[in-house]
């Protein structure tokens, strides 16, 4: 629903505080805003630590890291925009000096939320390309992959966000588009995972081992594809769940209901988006042992405790038991020599 109060433009979860005051709900609204501030503070701390892990701890391929940092970048802009909006809504701008900044913040937040809602397919495309270039993807950064994905993704999302803001397309069309894109991204990762599993098993078949038709780098990349598809499947479930919830709330703009009901749905959306932004990094963290190891190292450093060595694990993070290290080493290098001679 385009609002006359916003010059015939539509922003995601734009709440007119004048209407809230007229309804006598200012105290409740202010309380909810203060609770939201608490969530925002936690989100900032979480974001800064996540950024540190992305920069200094290599836990995935460069392209996947770059795409996740792009995902985090939109959340940073979204949080910054939301902080400006909340600051004004808490009554810190009685003379409306921040009017232009509020419009910019609403515009930026709407665009960033569109990026978050369309994000799933970019991870799917990156993993599909990693599967296609399996022979040398890990050895080469292939920066062009992430740049190509983002150069196509951002203009399309930006155009969609502008169409939403300018009321060129009905809300229901945007919501249907969100659903379709998210489902395609979710199914695509499952297909990519199944393909890599099948190919990985084929490489370990007796016929393939005897013919030695694969290289160690290719086998490693396949294992890496499978591992990261597992990680993405966990992250995707949370993204899909929250995207469906947020998109469903946006449908309130499509129906003729009381303005107060719409505003309460917007409040729910804001909290839903915050929980979304807090939960996804936690799920990603829980799926990456490298990040967990770095966190333990930092905690031990803070409390002055010596870091404890860890038992070796397999490619897929499973515990490995060595009864005789010499025998295990001989087996490994025997297999290595077979593939190189």
Curated annotation (Swiss-Prot):
List residues traversing the bilayer: 37-57, 64-86, 101-123, 143-163, 169-189, 235-255, 264-284
- GO BP of this protein: sensory perception of chemical stimulus
Please provide, in alphabetical order, the Gene Ontology terms of the cellular component aspect for this entry.
Answer: membrane
Keyword Ubl conjugation appears in the UniProt entry: no
**What highest taxon heads this organism's lineage?**
Eukaryota
State if Transmembrane helix is listed as a keyword.
yes
Tell me the membrane topology, using the record's own terms: Multi-pass membrane protein
Alphabetically sorted, this entry's keywords are: Membrane, Transmembrane, Transmembrane helix
The compartments listed are:
Membrane
Do you know which PANTHER family this protein is assigned to?
SERPENTINE RECEPTOR CLASS EPSILON-13-RELATED, SERPENTINE RECEPTOR, CLASS E (EPSILON)-RELATED
User: Which family, according to UniProt?
Assistant: Belongs to the nematode receptor-like protein sre family.
Q: What's the protein called, per UniProt?
A: Serpentine receptor class epsilon-8
Which organism's genome codes for this protein?
A: Caenorhabditis elegans
Q: What high-level taxonomic lineage is stated for the organism? A: Eukaryota, Metazoa, Ecdysozoa, Nematoda, Chromadorea
